[in-house]
Amino acid sequence: MSITSIRALLRSAVSLARTKPLRFTNLKDIKLRPPIPPTVENFQVSPDHPLWQFFPEGNQTTNAIREQDDLDHDSREWTSAELRQKSFEDLHRLWYIILKERNILAREVRLAESIGMRDVKQFNNIDYKLIKSLRRIKQVLLERHIAFERSQASPSVQEEKNEYLEEFSERYLNAEGKEIEEMDEKLDRLQYAFFGIEPTMDIETLQDDIDVNFIKGMEYSSNLKAQKYNKLNPESELELPLRGPMEELPFLLFDVEDAVQQVKELRESGQSRELYKIETIPFLSKAIKSHLEGQE
């Protein structure tokens, strides 16, 4: 299509549009609704709306900004000595309670400034106490982290840990009769205490759970289970030690007999191999996630 024909088409479209003016008929029959004044009653807000968390009394809050007398002026910040006595769960919970209160204060201060209220000093004073508490929580957590790293780096602590693992391995392999089930339960607890391997894994926390310590724990417990299986089943031809995470993982996810069968199938198919370090965590994350999704 040429430029001339396009221009002609545009002109005809404009001219046709002009020949059809907008007209209203029967104007007397048109009924107009009265205007709706903008009031709070015209809006319905869910009582469970997340933004209610920014108000001190939630959906029961009656004032957008608290009066000075309604503020808690007598409270004080948490001391480091008090925080050191709290568990990790308590510190985590306390951190978010304080953070929520800071968000409430920040909303009130921002609103007060937007409508010209200048006296927000009391709000800021309370916020300063909350900030000091948050800083002390971080300090206490840092102290614990440093203490943990020093304890892990201590040769004596590591030697004691290795001695205990060797002693446990001997008791586990020599267990007989009813002791076997009891030692299996102890192994599950040991995995969690020494290596952080949860008895029940969760997809939501999987990325945080799998680390170098997790891999070490899986190696220890899987080879221990395989050795026990060979001892109870002398006819078994399972060659030990296991060849890395690919063969160790089945012992973490399945019963020992099923795990042994899977390892044999891997070896017979030629798929079993030792993983590079850079492959290990992605492989474990993908395999465990797939297993957990299959159970849902």
Curated annotation (Swiss-Prot):
CC per GO annotation: mitochondrial large ribosomal subunit
InterPro entries: MRP-L47_sf, Ribosomal_uL29_mit
Keyword line: Mitochondrion, Ribonucleoprotein, Ribosomal protein, Transit peptide
Residue range covered by the transit peptide: 1-19
A single GO BP: mitochondrial translation
Name used for this protein in its record: Large ribosomal subunit protein uL29m
Locations listed in the record: Mitochondrion
Organism listed in the record: Lodderomyces elongisporus (strain ATCC 11503 / CBS 2605 / JCM 1781 / NBRC 1676 / NRRL YB-4239)
Family from the record: Belongs to the universal ribosomal protein uL29 family.
Pfam families: MRP-L47 (PF06984)
Record carries keyword Ribonucleoprotein: yes
Domain of life assignment: Eukaryota
Main location: mitochondrion
